[in-house]
A protein has these predicted regions:
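Acceptor-binding helix/loop patch of EC 2.4 sugar-transfer enzymes
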Residues: 81-122
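Short hydrophobic beta-strand element within catalytic cores of glycosyltransferases
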Residues: 282-285
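Conserved acidic donor-binding segment of nucleotide-sugar-dependent glycosyltransferases
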Residues: 297-298, 302-309, 318-323
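A short, well-ordered alpha-helix in the C-terminal region of glycosyltransferases
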Residues: 311, 318, 325-339, 348-351
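Aromatic "clamp/platform" in nucleotide-sugar-dependent glycosyltransferases that forms part
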Residues: 265
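Carbohydrate-associated surface elements
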Residues: 140, 161
């Protein structure tokens, strides 16, 4: 998420705007026994007040969806606070519903907080209803926002972009794609990323193909922890890379593989998908969220239903056996992703900011009894 914020921020700066990241150099948390995830939302309004007193005035404030409620509440009290744009990288309520459905599908335990009450969801829902504008990343989120009563004129759907480094590396690599093989999973080793389905699927494919290599990168856990989920007879062919430090390292990882697997039950719009597409990998993912907006099944990738281990296994097995098809899907994805630039994303975000500013001006004018 932070990478996306910096990439769009760079674009906005190029367009002539001034952008500050309050989670960076300005952020100073007070000592508290309360977990930071709960104190941060409460401190955002105070931080904006403090910066204003120091002469730092903002035209608009962008806040991540689960953190926006206290700021939106404070704006009702003090309308001199800048208008707020709520940015959702995957709606909290939809994430809750997706996890609940997935756990029931897999007969996993369901906590009371998941079923009835989740503080981040309550904060997010309040923010969505009371912010000046909402930015979301996929058409399913857009539709849900309208379903819960958010005016479509207060919604901007933005696509994530891909950095030029990946596009250039993919262009150079395309003629040599015959030399690539192996399957890559790139992401945190958590339930939401589909690890429960990935383990049996990839295990079966690796049993079918004794020379197949599989990489789990950026997982956030050490090798022993992740490998414990797999049978001993295939562990030697699984490479674990807990952390990735820079784009050069990431590009080298993509370069070594022909297939990306992303079986998440919920996402916003994963950067991994666009980067893999830029590098010409064939993508196997679920038919939901931002993946469904980009992947056309059988044309520039393969999609399967959430939790469908059999289809996931068959799709991966088919691509391993048919590298010509894998290259064809990868090349189609590489061509399509050329249009997904951070410049385009930044322009849409700037327009969303302007809509929030103009909406706030109209609201203040009406409160003062002024006419335009």
């Amino acid at each position: 998420m932070s990478r996306a914020m910096y990439c769009t921020g760079d674009t906005l700066i190029t367009m002539g705007h001034q952008v500050d990241y309050i989670f960076g150099e300005y952020w100073q948390l007070r000592a508290s026994v309360i977990p930071k995830r709960f104190t941060v939302p409460l401190q955002i309004p105070e931080l904006i007040y403090s910066l204003a007193q120091k002469g730092k005035q903002y035209d608009v404030v962008e806040i991540h969806e689960p953190l926006a409620a206290p700021y939106c509440f404070n704006r009702k009290i003090n309308q001199n606070l800048p208008p707020v744009v709520l940015f959702s990288h995957g709606l909290e309520k939809r994430n809750q519903l997706a996890e609940l459905a997935y756990r029931r599908q897999k007969c996993l335990p369901v906590s009371l907080s998941l079923r009835f009450l989740r503080l981040t969801v309550l904060q997010a829902m309040y923010g969505l209803q009371n912010c000046d504008h909402v930015i979301c990343l996929n058409s399913e989120d857009n539709g849900y926002l309208q379903q819960i009563g958010v005016d479509k004129n207060r919604i901007t759907q933005v696509n994530n972009g891909v950095e030029s480094q990946f596009l250039l590396a993919g262009e150079i690599l395309a003629p040599a794609s015959l030399s690539r093989s192996g399957i890559l999973f790139l992401g945190s080793w958590v339930l939401r990323k589909g690890t429960l389905d990935l383990v049996p699927a990839i295990s079966q494919v690796m049993q079918h193909h004794p020379s197949l290599q599989f990489t789990i990168a950026g997982c956030g856990f050490d090798a022993d922890t992740v490998l414990a989920d797999f049978a001993e007879d295939i562990r030697s062919r699984i490479q674990i890379i807990p952390k990735i430090s820079n784009n050069e390292e990431l590009i080298e990882i993509y370069r070594q593989h022909s297939i990306l697997v992303l079986p998440s039950y919920f996402e916003g719009q994963p950067l991994t998908m666009f980067e893999a597409a830029a590098m010409g990998l064939a993508i196997v993912t679920t038919n939901i969220c931002g993946m469904a907006d980009f992947i056309e099944n059988g044309i520039n990738g393969i999609t399967v239903s959430v939790g469908d281990v059999e289809s996931l296994t068959q799709s991966l097995d088919h691509l391993v056996e048919n590298q010509t098809l894998a290259r064809s899907l990868g090349e189609a994805a590489r061509q399509k992703v050329q249009a997904y630039t951070w410049e385009s994303a930044g322009e849409k975000i700037a327009k969303a900011y302007e809509k929030a500013i103009q909406s706030n001006k109209k609201h203040l004018s009406s409160k003062l009894g002024l006419t335009h």
